[in-house]
């Protein structure tokens, strides 16, 4: 693997095997409430299995890239202690698992837990929509600012995993998740980035959901570059999506200057682990499958990253484009649902796929 000489970049992208899930991980082991000692042991063993799968990819050609692991202390402390010795960068979460509002897993003691493992990256996950109640947004921003201040004072690098789930009104206006993801989420993400940056929250890396179009990805990337320090960058998260969907997101992101890798977890290991726990595969077979999924996404990213300039434009249409016809009335409904979350006017139609713009314009002329 490439020797680490600084933060990830286009020349040295970072490919993270994410396995920091805790509450959702427990559902695979039948956990209800607090896990038993037997369940804890099984989950910790499973995290070691996932890491073993990641290690099998360590000898693959990376074209300057580097590998990383994102793992939690609760279930993955043994893995965390082995990561850097194996040649991977270590990222660890600070947020409590399974909460809608961001809180620190270890409360005021979070710095001590970070320092005990000394990770290359500290990670926080937040769910944040500009249309959320003001009190919730203020509280979450304050928590992130506290982490940001700690990172600055201790000279630690940190990444923010930002999820922008639709409000009920936004989802109702879009009528389905696919339309929300394509036509509303990128612009709402821009608003979150500016709101957080204005409050002094400036992670080194924004860990973001994938975007269906080049226009959407560029919109968000431009916000990251304009709102925060110029060296800020983005990586793509996997969202437990099927392989073809993650491939599409990587195809969109990799050619764009400012995207510097990915952090994909369940799309690599969830189904192999389910099969292993059901007795349909042994440990060696499971490690091999996890490794191959991980390698696949690395190859996909590197192939897209090396595409000739301008080729990414051909990827603007989303994979499996099936959402309903966007009429002017629906456009107006989406705008209304997102009103107040879009003071900079970045919502539709400025970055919409050109095919949809032409369709809407034609309908306007007819009307």
Can you annotate each of these PLM segments?
Residues 127, 162-165, 211, 239-240, ...:
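Short, ordered loop/turn segments at secondary-structure junctions
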Residues 84-95, 140-158, 185, 218-234, ...:
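Alpha-helix-loop-beta-strand connector modules within alpha/beta enzyme cores
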Residues 223, 264-268:
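A glycine-rich, aromatic-flanked flexible loop/lid motif
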Residues 236-244:
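Glycine-rich beta-to-alpha transition loops that act as phosphate-gripper elements at the mouths
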Residues 52, 56-61, 108-121, 129, ...:
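Alpha/beta enzyme core
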Residues 17, 161, 206, 265:
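Conserved, mostly hydrophobic/aromatic
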Residues 160, 235, 261-263:
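Short hydrophobic alpha-helical runs that function as membrane-insertion/retention elements
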Residues 1-136, 202, 232, 244-247, ...:
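Alpha/beta catalytic barrel-like cores
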């Amino acid at each position: 693997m490439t020797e680490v000489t600084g933060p990830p970049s286009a020349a040295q992208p970072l490919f993270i095997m994410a396995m920091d899930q805790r509450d959702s991980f427990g559902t695979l082991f039948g956990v209800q409430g607090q896990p038993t000692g037997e369940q804890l042991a099984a989950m910790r063993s499973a995290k070691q299995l996932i890491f073993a799968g990641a290690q099998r990819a360590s000898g693959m050609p990376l074209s300057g890239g580097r590998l990383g692991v994102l793992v939690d202390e609760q279930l993955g402390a043994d893995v965390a202690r082995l990561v850097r010795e194996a040649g991977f960068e270590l990222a660890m979460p600070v947020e409590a698992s399974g909460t809608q509002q961001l809180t620190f897993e270890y409360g005021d003691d979070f710095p001590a837990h970070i320092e005990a493992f000394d990770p290359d990256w500290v990670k926080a996950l937040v769910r944040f929509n500009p249309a959320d109640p003001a009190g919730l947004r203020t509280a979450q921003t304050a928590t992130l600012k506290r982490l940001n201040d700690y990172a600055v004072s201790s000279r630690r690098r940190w990444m923010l995993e930002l999820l922008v789930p639709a409000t009920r009104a936004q989802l109702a206006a879009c009528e389905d998740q696919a339309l929300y993801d394509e036509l509303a989420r990128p612009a709402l993400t821009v608003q979150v980035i500016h709101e957080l940056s204005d409050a002094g929250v400036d992670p080194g890396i924004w860990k973001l959901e994938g975007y269906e179009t080049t226009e959407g990805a560029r919109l968000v990337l431009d916000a990251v570059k304009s709102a925060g320090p110029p060296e800020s960058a983005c990586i793509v998260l996997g969202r437990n999506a099927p392989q073809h969907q993650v491939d599409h997101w990587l195809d969109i992101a990799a050619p764009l200057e400012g995207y510097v890798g990915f952090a994909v977890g369940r799309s690599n290991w969830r189904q192999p682990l389910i099969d292993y726990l059901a007795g349909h595969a042994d440990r060696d077979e499971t490690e091999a499958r996890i490794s191959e999924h991980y390698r696949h996404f690395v190859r996909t990213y590197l192939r897209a990253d090396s595409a000739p300039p301008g080729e990414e434009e051909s990827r603007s249409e989303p994979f499996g484009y099936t959402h309903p016809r966007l009429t002017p009335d629906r456009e107006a409904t989406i705008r209304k649902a997102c009103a107040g979350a879009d003071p900079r006017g970045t919502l539709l139609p400025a970055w919409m796929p050109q095919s949809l713009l032409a369709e809407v314009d034609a309908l306007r002329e007819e009307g």
